[in-house]
């Protein structure tokens, strides 16, 4: 796959946008998913979902990235002042400096190194826990949307824990969770018109984005497959148990 095309797919289907996109697409194919919300009230709800699960975490990532770059810049000059040679500093901090170079090319929301993912993932987990509390316990609509928020929150927490030890594709995880949720939803509501094609499109998107992550070199095959298995399992289980 062409790398520019792979980057476009990875950006459009960013993991933090998936919960909102999933609820929106399910509403379009089956409006009863957000009963008793209808029409304008649903879109007000959807905007809040995108804010809580997408916009706020993305802003947090940007702020963390800016702070991260500023910190390394100060560290660089501090080491030079302390008479550490430039060559020595670059050799010791090569992975981090490569990361900065990539981000200065416009990839502000990518985290190529496993160790630099842990703290942002932890903070995003906290935001998702708050979102889950808000949408499940304070402003619950029905058991289906509750299951979606619980599944996505559990996945973010699990990915954070796994990332301490191994790198895993969160793109593959969230999109395969969407596949699992879609399959599970179809089990309980099998009479929805054209639902087979809806699920087929989600499966195709999941496959395309997973391929894109491999094409970009962001993950290897094991990391993508691990994400696919984890996401699908949690998503399907959430819908079965809801």
PLM features: residue spans?
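Membrane-interface helix termini and inter-helical loops of multi-pass transporters
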Residues: 31-40, 106-109, 138-142, 189-191
């Amino acid at each position: 796959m062409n790398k520019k095309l792979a980057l476009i797919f990875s950006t459009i289907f960013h993991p933090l946008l998936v919960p909102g996109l999933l609820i929106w697409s399910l509403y379009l194919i089956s409006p009863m998913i957000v009963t008793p919300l209808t029409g304008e009230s649903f879109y007000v709800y959807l905007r809040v979902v995108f804010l809580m699960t997408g916009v706020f975490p993305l802003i947090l990532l940007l702020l963390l990235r800016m702070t991260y770059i500023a910190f390394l810049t100060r560290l660089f000059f501090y080491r030079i002042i302390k008479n550490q040679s430039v060559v020595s500093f670059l050799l010791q901090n090569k992975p981090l400096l490569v990361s900065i170079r990539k981000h200065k090319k416009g990839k502000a929301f990518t985290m190529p190194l496993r160790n630099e993912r842990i703290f942002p993932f932890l903070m995003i987990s906290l935001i998702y826990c708050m979102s889950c509390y808000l949408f499940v316990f304070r402003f619950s609509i029905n058991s289906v949307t509750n299951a979606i928020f619980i599944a996505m929150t559990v996945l973010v927490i699990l990915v954070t824990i796994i990332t301490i030890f191994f790198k895993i594709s969160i793109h593959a995880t969230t999109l395969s969770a969407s596949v699992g949720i879609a399959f599970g939803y179809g089990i309980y509501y099998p009479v929805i018109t054209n639902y087979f094609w809806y699920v087929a499109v989600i499966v195709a998107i999941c496959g395309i984005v997973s391929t894109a992550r491999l094409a970009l070199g962001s993950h290897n095959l094991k990391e993508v497959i691990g994400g696919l298995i984890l996401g699908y399992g949690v998503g399907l289980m959430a819908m079965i148990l809801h």
